[in-house]
């Protein structure tokens, strides 16, 4: 296999380093903004040197972002090249277009590292769904958020924990995609499309991040025997899919509560096989690069071109997803009064309320400048 590598940052450099030990998978050209000693004569700053080279049969895209990644992936496929990517942003935004094009051109399109980093999640999901019905996918899918929450449990502030995460390379300089939820949302969206063999758009999934979490919120939940995580969940029942990303509280001793630091836990619930979970590093140079290399080996072994066949829109109805919440706010609002089950100091425990309704209410408070925090309490069947 002759490989063209689009991008030589953290992941791209890791892929190149791993592949030096495998003569069967040869990186023959590297696109980067600048050359290094490791690239030597393979360096180019022109994408066409890779995309138009007939000797290159597989392209690895690890640039990040939607553009020009989408255009270059598409051009590679039209040239009859297989594509492996770790770029969740472009896969989520252009899912149907890229999967359709890979079929049209009869080339492989793999993106295991885009949803799970170093965890072989999508390939495992691909395998189990052939023999069982996937009822739900779920998990703690962002290591940056999990590290921040783990640090805050020790008494530190959100800002201090974020700064530590950035210093360790767990969070980007602009942490918005991590702490506000889009990174988790994209992983859930990709996982849901594959699990339920159809298409759900990013904007069909309600999403909230952890930016409003305070140290005292974690202390309050700890008194209740709960730990906070940024939780992704999607389930299919009676032909309808419900999905959400939001802060959620889990009982101490549960598997999700036990995931600490920058680790991820991703899993699914099967009709016959029960719960299946995977734990590992969801990001990082070599964990992510290793998943890219696994995809390359699958392509070389002529494994399936993609993980699922369906591209038809799924019937999304998030109103069927109802949860109890713990809410901290100074607002006095008729809706809040209506859903209050009990008051506990600065916090309110709600009656079960639909996720879209709660998210809309929280967004309206924030739009008015009212500070608010909310943690869902998912039903046990969602995670155990």
Regions found by a protein language model. Give the residues of each.
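Glycine-rich adenosine-cofactor-binding loop
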Residues: 2-17
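NAD(P)-binding Rossmann-fold cofactor-contacting core
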Residues: 21-39
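Rossmann-fold NAD(P) dinucleotide-binding segment
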Residues: 45-86
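Rossmann-fold NAD(P)-binding glycine/threonine-rich loop
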Residues: 70-75, 88-126
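Oxidoreductase and adenylate-handling cofactor-binding alpha/beta cores
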Residues: 119-134, 148-158, 186-200, 295
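Catalytic, metal-anchored helix/loop core of enzyme active sites in primary metabolism
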Residues: 134-141, 146-152, 164, 170-175, ...
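Substrate-binding/catalytic subdomain of NAD(P)-dependent oxidoreductase enzymes
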Residues: 162-265
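A conserved regulatory-domain signal marking ACT and ACT-like small-molecule sensing domains
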Residues: 296-298, 302-384
């Amino acid at each position: 296999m002759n490989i063209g590598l689009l991008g030589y940052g953290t992941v791209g450099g890791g892929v190149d380093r791993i592949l030096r030990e495998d003569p069967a998978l040869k990186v023959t050209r590297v696109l980067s903004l600048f050359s290094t000693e490791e690239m030597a004569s393979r360096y180019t700053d022109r994408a066409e040197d890779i995309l138009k080279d007939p000797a290159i049969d597989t392209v690895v895209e690890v640039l990040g972002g939607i553009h020009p990644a989408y255009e270059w992936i598409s051009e590679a496929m039209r040239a009859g090249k297989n594509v492996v990517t770790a770029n969740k942003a472009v896969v989520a935004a252009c899912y149907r277009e890229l999967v359709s094009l890979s079929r049209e051109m009869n080339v492989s399109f793999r993106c295991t590292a885009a949803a799970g980093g170093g965890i072989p999640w999508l390939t495992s999901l691909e395998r189990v769904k052939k023999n069982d019905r996937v009822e739900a996918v779920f998990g703690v899918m962002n290591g940056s958020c999990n590290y921040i929450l783990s640090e805050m449990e020790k008494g530190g502030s959100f800002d201090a924990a974020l700064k530590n995460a950035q210093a360790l390379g767990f969070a980007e300089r602009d942490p918005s995609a991590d702490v506000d939820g889009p990174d988790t949302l994209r992983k859930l969206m990709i996982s849901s499309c594959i699990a339920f063999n159809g298409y759900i758009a990013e904007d069909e999934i309600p999403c909230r991040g952890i930016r409003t979490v305070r140290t005292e919120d974690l202390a309050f939940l700890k008194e209740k025997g709960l730990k906070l995580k940024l939780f992704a969940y999607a389930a299919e029942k009676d032909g309808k899919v419900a999905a959400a990303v939001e802060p959620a509280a889990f009982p101490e001793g549960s598997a999700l509560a036990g995931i600490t630091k920058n680790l991820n836990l991703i899993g699914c619930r099967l009709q016959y096989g029960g719960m299946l979970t995977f734990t590992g590093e969801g990001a990082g140079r070599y964990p992510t690069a290793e998943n890219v290399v696994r995809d390359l080996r699958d392509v070389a072994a002529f494994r399936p071109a993609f993980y699922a066949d369906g591209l038809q829109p799924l019937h999304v109805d998030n109103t069927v997803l109802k949860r109890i919440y713990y809410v901290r706010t100074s607002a006095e609002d008729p809706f809040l009064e209506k859903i209050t089950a009990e008051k506990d100091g600065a916090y309110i425990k709600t009656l079960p309320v639909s996720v879209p309704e709660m998210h809309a209410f929280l967004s309206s408070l924030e739009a008015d400048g009212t500070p608010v925090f909310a943690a869902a309490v998912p039903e046990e069947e969602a995670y155990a």
